């Protein structure tokens, strides 16, 4: 399963929001990846997410594969919206 988000936060995905996304993803057993600008990283890795330097207005793709993939994507979408990170 996959979902594309547009980053709306003025400061993009910096340390605090990256930590929130990693913590959300880490609650699930599925393999969850984030793709940005041709690079694909494990969404459960803070260093991987931070290495992408995701800016405002960027499009990111999050993919989840596993038994709880749908729940994982729903939780990540909720975190993105609740924290004003993206839509």
Curated annotation (Swiss-Prot):
GO terms for biological process: phosphoenolpyruvate-dependent sugar phosphotransferase system. This is Phosphocarrier protein HPr. It is found in: Cytoplasm. Keywords: Cytoplasm, Phosphoprotein, Phosphotransferase system, Sugar transport, Transcription, Transcription regulation, Transport. The modification Phosphoserine is found at residue 45. The keyword Phosphoprotein applies. It comes from the Bacteria. Phosphorylation on Ser-45 inhibits the phosphoryl transfer from enzyme I to HPr. It comes from Bacillus thuringiensis subsp. israelensis. The active site is at 14 (pros-phosphohistidine intermediate). InterPro entries: HPr (IPR050399), HPr-like (IPR000032), HPr-like_sf (IPR035895), PTS_HPr_His_P_site (IPR001020), PTS_HPr_Ser_P_site (IPR002114). Gene3D superfamilies: HPr-like (3.30.1340.10). Disulfide bonds: none annotated. CDD domains: PTS-HPr_like (cd00367). One of its GO terms (cellular component) is cytoplasm.
């Amino acid at each position: 399963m996959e979902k594309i988000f547009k980053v709306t936060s003025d400061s993009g995905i910096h340390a605090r929001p990256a930590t929130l996304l990693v913590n959300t993803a880490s609650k699930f057993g599925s393999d969850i990846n984030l793709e940005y600008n041709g690079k694909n990283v494990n969404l459960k890795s803070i260093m991987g997410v931070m290495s992408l330097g995701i800016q405002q207005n960027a499009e990111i793709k999050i993919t989840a594969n596993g038994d709880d993939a749908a729940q994982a994507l729903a939780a990540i979408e909720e975190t993105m919206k609740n924290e004003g990170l993206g839509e």
